């Protein structure tokens, strides 16, 4: 279920238009595998292009992992851990979080509630009806998989209100949780349309106003937030969801005459103002999963590439439902190559039987100090340095380098945690310093032939080496998996500092031994080997596991070692 959510997220993220910077490769070139792409990071006022590796996930999965970690780390105190540790820390590494989520995280960072005290803060909070709550609630479902839905619903609501206040967000989370919960209890295979019927049958359970048991401060704020009162808004939203589910059932009853894209477009899943609605996404995911149980691969491919949709979240929620009902074998190579797959599988297993040993909850001051200390150490640490994260995990710096995009520069740091999560932090975003430009004196403007000849030896500069490959997309995926980032790229080339890899003009495959060997030093050879083998490259381990080689292109072998100088 968690792995399916991550796969759907990673499949859909490149197709989300607000993050995409350029056209993507044709589907025929990337069918059946993840691919590298570029997104616009930072903000629209300070845009920075970021390279995204094959199978990397967005904030959807980051928050899902944060919720799972809070439950496993703090036990019964998971909610306080989420507010005090996870949400402030998310601001440092999030990849595409929505405005409502980031606004709430900043409030918890300042030890304030997400709903605030000022009227404008409360208006923004109780207007937040997006899918940011629904996308992350799967860990609660696993914890309560054998319990009552009432207990699950209470935890889902307590989690959801840490970032969102509108009934559409809360009911979206509850409906999605119910669909996951009931799917876990239904033996496979799932009948066509069964999940929609189950969701309608469960109306009496997920419609319950469990928000009425929340903190008094929240209830007081909610009572004044919406015209007609919160209870009326809740009932109206319940009716919206019931109508949507009924429409979804009618669409499925039409069978082959109904196209899933038509349903999504008709109900606002492709319109900018409504595509991120919590209730719309929850019902759309149920609809897509209900019609795709016999072909789950297609079930996540449709939302992942639906033009105009919130593709990463919709595909993630759909895939999590299919995972809950069908397991994870159908994910195939996607499940093996999605970012942090081993960690995600382990989190799901641990949530089934949580351990009784938990960490002591930090005080607010202790949590603040831990995060401040981490950021200070991060900024002055060298590559390969070890760091203690605010959530008390150990991590090491895998790579660090500058990012330049237009008039802006930044520094990106890639961290690998001891438990197997990869984090990418973009810091020090600032306007690039303009190069000094001055008018050249006339006496210097036209050097003589003799002057040019005498200056050549000192001014000559090696720009780099060009390497042709038969499949530049596949080669880029492999190098990204090794932690190498490309600061510049064109339509048929990618630049790794002084090495430029270029798509060969001919698509004929090379014969015999590859012409070039690229040597890469990396700290964790075993992890790199497993990652590349999971991508189906040929190769072999050498030096008792301290090195290996893989053929990533007919023209190119990559030799990887553990940072020791090669012999000979």
Question: Where on the chain are the PLM-derived regions?
Answer:
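Short glycine/proline-centered loop/turn elements that form peptide/ligand docking sites
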Residues: 474, 490-494
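Amphipathic alpha-helical segments
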Residues: 470-485, 528-534
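Short, ordered beta-strand-loop transition motifs
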Residues: 403-408, 487-491, 542-545
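Short, charged/polar, Gly/Pro-enriched secondary-structure boundary elements
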Residues: 500-504, 508-512, 555-559, 566-567
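Vicinal oxygen chelate
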Residues: 460-470, 489, 495, 507-568
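N-terminal beta-strand motif that seeds the catalytic metal site of vicinal oxygen chelate
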Residues: 451-476, 516-518, 564-568
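Structured, active/binding-site neighborhoods that engage oxygen-rich ligands
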Residues: 1-455
